[in-house]
Design a protein with these regions (language model features):
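Residue-level signal for short, function-critical loop segments
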Residues: 34, 70, 142
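A donor-sugar binding/catalytic signature common to diverse glycosyltransferases
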Residues: 103-144
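A nucleotide-sugar donor-handling region in carbohydrate enzymes
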Residues: 1-43
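Short catalytic/ligand-binding loop motif for oxyanion handling, primarily in non-cytosolic enzymes
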Residues: 36-40, 72-76, 128
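Catalytic donor nucleotide-activated moiety binding site of glycosyltransferases and closely related
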Residues: 59-104
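Structural beta-sheet core signal
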Residues: 30, 64-66, 138
């Protein structure tokens, strides 16, 4: 599917995306990757925490579609165990609150087509996203606000 209308969107995602009047919020693909984790460690997890807070405050207008690298948790377990607990807590809170979408499916194309803009770490997804012509902003872990 290359158009939003053709996508198979889960009902729980639509619950996050649709406004009360039936129109759609702007959807931001938030992609978090392994290279940034390995470079920035605790600071990277702190950045995610701040990003989630900002998007939660703006959830009436913006739907966040958080898509972490599929190997992020196993990488933390083996290479950065000191950040795993805080990361897992953030992930579980995000999912439990239900104001955003947590996408751990294999279907990266759906996330790219569905979203209106990309925010997050530099990764192979950026190359894919660039082909859409939609806005891309790479997060800077050094800037916390």
């Amino acid at each position: 599917a290359t158009k939003k209308e053709e996508l198979n969107i889960p009902q729980e995602w639509l619950h996050v995306i649709e406004k009360a009047d039936g129109s759609w919020k702007k959807i931001i693909l938030y992609n978090t990757g392994i290279a940034a984790l390995l470079t920035h460690n605790e600071k990277w997890v702190g950045k995610i925490e701040n990003v989630l807070k900002i998007f939660e405050e703006n959830q009436d207008e913006i739907a966040l579609l958080w898509r972490p690298h599929p190997l992020i948790e196993s990488t933390m377990k083996s290479m950065r165990p000191e950040v795993l607990q805080k990361y897992m807590m953030l992930k579980q809170q995000y999912i439990a609150k239900g104001w955003g979408i947590y996408d751990e499916t294999a279907d990266v194309d759906r996330a790219v087509v569905l979203s209106d803009a990309y925010y997050g770490d530099g990764s192979s997804v950026v190359q894919l996203y660039r082909q859409t012509g939609k806005p891309i902003m790479i997060q800077n872990v050094e800037i916390m606000t």
